[in-house]
Design a protein with these regions (language model features):
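Mid-to-C-terminal alpha-helical segments outside catalytic/metal-binding sites
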Residues: 82-118
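Structural detector of well-ordered beta-strand residues that form the stable sheet scaffold
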Residues: 13-15, 35, 61-63
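Single conserved hydrophobic/aromatic residue that forms the stacking wall/gate
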Residues: 1-12
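Short acidic/histidine-rich active-site segments
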Residues: 58-80
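Glycine-enriched alpha-helix->loop->beta-strand junction motifs that scaffold or abut catalytic
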Residues: 9, 23-37, 56-59
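Active-site glycine- and acidic-residue-rich loops that bind
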Residues: 35-50
Length: 118
């Protein structure tokens, strides 16, 4: 978990979110962003998908956590940014978004969470 002060506000980012919807509600009530890695694509990730389902569109982030937490199509292999589209597509499908909407929403969220371009 990461928290930092920006413009007199505290930004909370739950990295590699791997908990259930109950904890997600608590985090979201405090303004947290939930960041999902490739593990959300695993068959066993039901609780993570429940958390994704309740998160507001503008509080969802995506990450690789490379070289670990590789998405399902390549599970067990070395992870990297080149596999991020698998996770983005999975999140898009879960949210009912097309790929363009997912890319735009997740990009906008990253700018909001991290304060703009790096």
């Amino acid at each position: 978990h990461t928290a930092y002060r920006r413009q007199r506000q505290v930004c909370i980012r739950d990295s590699c979110y791997s908990c259930d919807a109950d904890l997600a509600r608590i985090c979201l009530d405090h303004g947290a962003y939930l960041s999902f890695s490739g593990t959300i694509t695993f068959n066993s990730a039901g609780p993570q998908r429940d958390a994704l389902a309740i998160a507001p569109d503008h509080h969802i982030l995506v990450e690789t956590d490379a070289p670990f937490l590789t998405p399902a199509p390549r599970r067990g292999k070395r992870n990297g940014p080149y596999l991020l589209p698998h996770t983005v597509r999975f999140i898009a499908k879960q949210r009912g978004w097309d790929e363009a909407r997912a890319c735009q929403q997740l990009t906008d969220n990253a700018f909001a969470a991290y304060g703009g371009a790096w």
